[in-house]
Amino acid sequence: MGCVKLVFFMLLKLDLLEFKNMFTVNPNASDYCYDYTDQRMQSYPRTLFWNKSTDCCSWDGIHCDETTGQVVELDLRCSQLQGKFHSNSSLFQLSNLKRLDLSFNDFTGSLISPKFGEFSDLTHLDLSDSNFTGVIPSEISHLSKLHVLRIHDLNELSLGPHNFELLLKNLTQLRELNLDSVNISSTIPSNFSSHLTNLWLPYTELRGVLPERVFHLSDLEFLHLSYNPQLTVRFPTTKWNSSASLMKLYVHSVNIADRIPESFSHLTSLHALYMGRCNLSGHIPKPLWNLTNIESLFLGDNHLEGPIPQLTRFEKLKRLSLGNNNLHGGLEFLSFNRSWTQLEILYFSSNYLTGPIPSNVSGLQNLGWLFLSSNHLNGSIPSWIFSLPSLVVLDLSNNTFSGKIQEFKSKTLSTVTLKQNQLEGPIPNSLLNQESLQFLLLSHNNISGYISSSICNLKTLMVLDLGSNNLEGTIPQCVGERNEYLLDLDLSNNRLSGTINTTFSIGNSFKAISLHGNKLTGKVPRSLINCKYLKLLDLGNNQLNDTFPNWLGYLSQLKILSLRSNKLHGPIKSSGSTNLFMRLQILDLSSNGFSGNLPERILGNLQTMKKIDENTRFPEYISDQYEIYYVYLTTITTKGQDYDSVRILDSNMIINLSKNRFEGHIPSIIGDLVGLRTLNLSRNALEGHIPASFQNLSVLESLDLSSNRISGEIPQQLASLTFLEVLNLSHNHLVGCIPKGKQFDSFGNTSYQGNDGLRGFPLSKLCGVDDQVTTPAELDQEEEEEDSPMISWQGVLVGYGCGLVIGLSVIYIMWSTQYPAWFSRMDLKLEHIITTRMKKHKKRY
């Protein structure tokens, strides 16, 4: 027997070592590590110290039965394991396991093996956040002794409706079920374990009506069903069996069928209620005021109205969110709640609150997050806010607060956004001495004074928005040198002067730089070439005196470039590289002194403009993940007017070269930029014809070629541009008949004035019989009769979301990016045939 037992332990050790050797140890594999109570854990490589010279039952993460010596527990959570988890893993030789935890590792691309269902004695199984993928096998439902099952992951795990029902039916001993973010796409059956204490099913595509039996589970402590918009929840009108035990109820973004019933008053143990985005309406439900043990109450993103009650019974409150509702009245209740000594978060943004913030508020020494943005609050910001010792985030933006920004007592500030108010005075020194400040947004106020070089001491700063104030002086030289985490810099629309003398250091993180609307002089700083992540550069409306900085084209991420309204001059020369400005979506060089021909090589490099993204489900914004605190600002001219665009859609593509001294012909290569929405070449000295290739600009909405020397006829093919909303061809030398078509028939006289040779609607000079323009359909028929070679028009309707934009807006906010696209182009021979038939002895365009 001794030999048999020895062999058994040797085999057991070999199985464990073989399992260890399947994976590498990588600290990044357990980056985000939490225990089941959502407390952050420290990861460490448990298997690193396993070796064959020691007893495997003493190894970290392993627990053996004292009698049999069998491994009964294997806890490898947060063990930094990385690699493929194979279905023939030696792990499955440990047939006596009762607890198995492999959570918070990285098994990317691995399927959950059906062999997990062979651990018949298993009571705890946790495979969470380890990047498993595919379908959860039905064999998991064979683990009839399970008390805890956690398989939550963001890596496209799914569980078919049948398997979900089977799992709930067979696992009758379950205490905790966590399938967070697993695609279930099913209703919830009513036959599930009566022992459940924790039921976590958020983001699981649940639908139908939640069985009322869930609320009568006598041991239920935590119910999490959030983010299932197709799930309908009806709360019992009578007392729940779980009333005494239920501590956390998360039903955010589900469909609440009826009003909150009086039965809520009996939830005496409830600590946290998340009921945002549930279409709640009317006044804040009165049954909630009896929840005297509540610590977290989130009712935001609903349609609640009326004043905010005093809430004096919530003495244990830590987190309160009523934002994005229709609440009105003042904030007087803050003066009456002196017992809120534990309050940490107060979120009342986006309501209709009015009046000043009460000045006699006390007892909020633990308040760390205060959100009152987008209301109608006024008056000065009271001193108690600046005196909060634990303040981390302050958002009072988009109100009408006035007065000075006082010095902050807190040393732990992460975000301060006071933009869009009427604040004045200098930037307080206490803001410039923060060790953890990441977002500082003070734009659109009346802040004055100089920008101190102390701002460079903010080592963690990611967004600095001081635009649209009265700041003067020079830009601190250190801004581009010492703030290595700074992503977005907006100093636009101030009174800053001098040269841009900052040196942008190698390895910086800038994504957006806007210095628009100042009095800056000198040249475009060459060190900008070090901003390799830059997406937006706006130096417009200054007094820069330089030639075109062609080297900016090497910034491979650049999407928006505005150099408008400066003193830039000379021809735009480009190198032989075809990789310059490839991702550019907005190019604004207007109101300068550029001369020579239009930059044909640069226009030919604009690869992003050469395609229409018809498959994007939702529009993306240039400001990506930081949009919550900051949006880019740039001013562009489109449809004849200047606009400050607060958000630039990823699908918006604009070229503005107006008000320069460009001459020569319009390059036909512009017709390859099929994604172009706005083209403005007005007020130059351009000549020649309008290229027929413009017919390919199928999503073009605004075309301005006015005040040039363009001659010839308007190409009849332009009548196919069904999205064209604004057209200005005035003050040129155009002749012939104006094309007829749905869009062209909507343009008035001003689109064509100053062209004495033009005829046809809407002008008073009509086209005679001899001048009648042949439509594209007629041309096709005639060419077929003559058997002439041609490429026929083929309109491919791909569908569209919002159609034409309402009003004059540069951002054209559309919630679908699918548009009609016309892919066929006439070749030169066809062009010759068409123009000859339209007007004998005329030149080709």
Curated annotation (Swiss-Prot):
It is a single-pass type I membrane protein. Residues 20-794 are extracellular. Residues 1-19 form the signal peptide. One of its GO terms (cellular component) is plasma membrane. Pfam families: LRR_1 (PF00560), LRR_6 (PF13516), LRR_8 (PF13855), LRRNT_2 (PF08263). Gene3D superfamilies: Ribonuclease Inhibitor (3.80.10.10). Keywords: Cell membrane, Glycoprotein, Leucine-rich repeat, Membrane, Repeat, Signal, Transmembrane, Transmembrane helix. LRR repeats lie at residues 71-94, 95-118, 119-143, 144-171, 172-193, 194-217, 219-242, 244-266, 267-291, 292-316, 318-338, 340-364, 365-388, 390-410, 411-434, 436-458, 459-482, 484-506, 507-531, 532-554, 555-579, 581-605, 649-672, 673-696, 698-721, 723-741. It is found in: Cell membrane. It comes from the Eukaryota. Residues 20-70 are annotated as: N-cap. Induction: Repressed by sly-miR6023. The chain crosses the membrane at residues 795-815. Glycans are attached at residues 28, 51, 88, 131, 170, 183, 191, 241, 279, 290, 337, 360, 378, 398, 446, 501, 545, 656, 680, 696, 728, 749. At the opposite of its homolog Cf-9 found in S.pimpinellifolium, was not able to confer resistance to the fungal pathogen C.fulvum. PANTHER family: LEUCINE-RICH REPEAT RECEPTOR PROTEIN KINASE EMS1-LIKE-RELATED (PTHR48061), LEUCINE-RICH REPEAT-CONTAINING N-TERMINAL PLANT-TYPE DOMAIN-CONTAINING PROTEIN (PTHR48061:SF10). Belongs to the RLP family. The extracellular leucine-rich repeats are required for the specificity of the elicitor protein recognition. This is Receptor-like protein Cf-9 homolog. It comes from Solanum lycopersicum.
